[in-house]
Amino acid sequence: MSYYTLPPIDPIIMSLGPISIRWYGLMYVIGFFATYFLVRQQIQRHQFTQLEKNFDNLNTVLILCVILGGRLGYVVFYNLSYYLQHPLEILATWHGGMSFHGACIALILGGLIFCKIKKIDFWATADVYVATIPIGLGLGRIGNLINGELYGRVTEQPWGIIFPNGGPLPRHASQLYESLLEGLILFIILWSLRNRPWKRNSLTPHGTILSLFLCLYGLFRIIIENFRQPDPQLGFIVAHITMGQLLSGAMILCGLTLWFWRIHQKKRATAL
């Protein structure tokens, strides 16, 4: 059987002196801009003046959270022993190594602290933002595909792809699977439900979209990890379970706990 061979693609689009513009970085930038404009649209629609006054400052904080949290998450979750021996490599983000789970933790903590200081409704803010996050996730996986990294396990399926750095055998294009599930499909679901928390339903209080995001992303990631090649420095953590699946399972538990807690809070507030 003949399989498609992914040609080697230069990860650098262009260089301007010492500055290199990379495909992966470009995907991040497009994701940030998409989030910026869609969130601003929602702020104006729902007249969320608390957030509107602090919008640009919060965006700056969240961008830093993505970069710092994503990098530190990779260091801690995926290669801690290496970075303890080579601490300066933690700063070398251009060598690759970002974790969405780390970025997610940093985004929630950073957003929570900012909203508390500025006296903004955190749960409403989180719902507005997370409905757009799958755009960046989907684009990021396209960047991984272009870089020929994070490829899937060996397969005999006719849609297998031979990757430049993946050896001679065809593999699952797990980057495309993730881009579809964690990107397009997750975005369609969250975006279609984005207005529910504003309708004062006791089953969909503010925080519902965040809860749903945690649950669905966790579920989709667990599914895709069955096709994705485990990180070589870690392999399987327990039996055939990867680090990504363990972290995603924790996300699902957090999402369910948060949703039930927010419903309980909403019912108590209504009773009063």
UniProtKB/Swiss-Prot annotation:
Gene Ontology cellular component list: plasma membrane
Keyword flag RNA-binding: no
Record-level Gene Ontology MF annotations: phosphatidylglycerol-prolipoprotein diacylglyceryl transferase activity
Membrane-spanning intervals of the chain: 19-39, 58-78, 94-114, 207-227, 234-254
Pathway(s): Protein modification; lipoprotein biosynthesis (diacylglyceryl transfer)
Enzyme category, top tier: transferase
Subcellular location: Cell inner membrane
InterPro entries named in the record: Lgt
UniProt keyword list: Cell inner membrane, Cell membrane, Membrane, Transferase, Transmembrane, Transmembrane helix
Primary location group: membrane
Assigned EC number: 2.5.1.145
Keyword Chloroplast: no
Listed GO biological process terms: lipoprotein biosynthetic process
Membrane topology: Multi-pass membrane protein
Record-listed a 1,2-diacyl-sn-glycero-3-phospho-(1'-sn-glycerol) binding positions: R141
Function: Catalyzes the transfer of the diacylglyceryl group from phosphatidylglycerol to the sulfhydryl group of the N-terminal cysteine of a prolipoprotein, the first step in the formation of mature lipoproteins.
Family affiliation: Belongs to the Lgt family.
Protein name: Phosphatidylglycerol--prolipoprotein diacylglyceryl transferase
Native species: Desulfotalea psychrophila (strain LSv54 / DSM 12343)
